[in-house]
């Protein structure tokens, strides 16, 4: 009888562990996510957004007709640092949210619409800048110099 109790408690313990792992994995944002939802559900992103002070501001005209795809992982420390910085800078420049596409990726760097594969994402975060549906540049994982300098390098050379 004691072995039955031991097996029963072992089963309950194992089941509770697997259930909590599933919940943790499923709590990540995968696919399209709004800025509001990101900040409401992931406090670290909101805190990093509030703490970041953009450097030398860029001319908002540089962003004319630019679509920005932000492919990131909630689970990624680089994403937790860089995504809020980009969003703060874009907000400071009054870039409309409909030009900003936040796409949460899983650990395999993909999501249900396969945009991780489409954009050939190897590292997160990756910021992809498109004009007329053609890629004009990207920032992978973190800026080379600074966010502002890298954006000026990418967008400043466009007509």
Question: What is the role of each PLM region?
Answer:
Residues 1-24:
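Bacterial Sec-dependent N-terminal signal peptides
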Residues 20-63:
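N-terminal leader/targeting and pre-domain segments
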Residues 64-74:
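Short active-site neighborhood of thiol/selenol oxidoreductases, capturing the structured segment around
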Residues 71, 97-111:
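Thiol-based oxidoreductase modules, predominantly thioredoxin-like and allied folds used
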Residues 73-82:
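Conserved redox-active cysteine motifs that mediate thiol-disulfide chemistry
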Residues 92-96:
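Short helix-capping segments at alpha-helix termini
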Residues 123, 129-159:
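Non-catalytic, surface beta->alpha helical segment in thiol-disulfide oxidoreductase systems
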């Amino acid at each position: 009888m004691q072995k039955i109790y031991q097996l029963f408690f072992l089963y309950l313990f194992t089941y509770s562990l697997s259930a909590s792992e599933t919940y943790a994995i499923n709590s990540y944002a995968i696919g399209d996510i709004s800025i509001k939802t990101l900040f409401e559900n992931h406090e670290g992103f909101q805190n990093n957004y509030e703490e970041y002070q953009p450097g030398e501001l860029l001319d908002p005209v540089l962003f004319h007709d630019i679509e920005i795809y932000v492919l990131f992982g909630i689970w990624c420390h680089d994403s937790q640092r860089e995504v809020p910085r980009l969003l703060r800078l874009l907000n400071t420049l009054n870039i409309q949210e409909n030009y900003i596409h936040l796409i949460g990726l899983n650990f395999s760097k993909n999501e249900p619409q396969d945009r991780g594969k489409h954009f050939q994402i190897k590292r997160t975060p990756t910021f992809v800048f498109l004009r007329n549906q053609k890629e004009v540049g990207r920032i992978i994982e973190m800026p080379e110099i600074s966010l502002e300098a890298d954006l000026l390098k990418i967008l400043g050379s466009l007509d």
